[in-house]
Amino acid sequence: NGAAPFIIPAMGSHGGATAEGQKNLLEGYGITEKNMGCPIHSSMDVKKIGKTADGRDVYIDRLAAEADGIIVVGRIKPHTAFRGPYQSGLMKMMAIGLGKQYGASVCHAEGFQRMGYNVQTFGNAIIKHANILCGVGIVENAFDETRKIKVMSKEDIGRMEPELLKEAEQHMPRILWPACDVLIVDEIGKNFSGDGMDPNVTGSFATPYASGGIQAERICLLDLSPETHGNGMGTGMASVITRRIFNQLDVNMMYINAMTCKNLNGSRIPCVMTNDKDCLLYTSP
């Protein structure tokens, strides 16, 4: 009663690291002011709120820092590039998402081999220094449907998120063959995975710090999702893409994303074929 809620995009450097780009991404998921019944305030400005346990400065979105309270909402699932007790979830949403491009750059500066440590360290610092009210963790099933929604007090986020991550791992989609000659992917996009296509399913990992999924000799990509707004992160892990994908690529958005996370592999452009048929012919054994 009496609250005046508003929504803040918590997505690090996504959306081309611009306020407008991040708001557009939310709108692509149906998160609009009309649908949600409250304002969406998108900004890349950050404010220092304290230091980590190891002495590093902690910054989060300025509007979030100045709000009376923050409710962190996010999906919990295995990450595409590193392993640890906290992967894609609320701790990462705070450390990198609320930290905007600054937070993303700091957490990625030491590479994915240190990402698990940095997510936990910065996440704990934000819980300590920011006005976090609670967290809302979402776990999906293998069909991208909501399996569980768990509300956690800020004191319980650190304890409960690893348990929800284990549950999410058990219900991840998977391809039941261990290996194949050619893997055909109809669409990739940031709405499916930060890497465009989830390597936990496709096996197309861009770092050596995570593994799993099917082992494909070649990967063929046919299209980008409309929701990804031209961000073709993940094309670099394919063998071949269509001209249709190439013509939609917003390379500036891709490169900002790739440079921020210090991993250029996913932003590379592979062989480009005229149509789906040529893609399949080129990759066929």
Model-derived regions, located:
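Short acidic, glycine/serine/threonine-rich loops at helix termini
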Residues: 17-22, 51-54, 81-86, 146-151, ...
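An acidic, phosphate/nucleotide-engaging active-site surface
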Residues: 21, 25-85
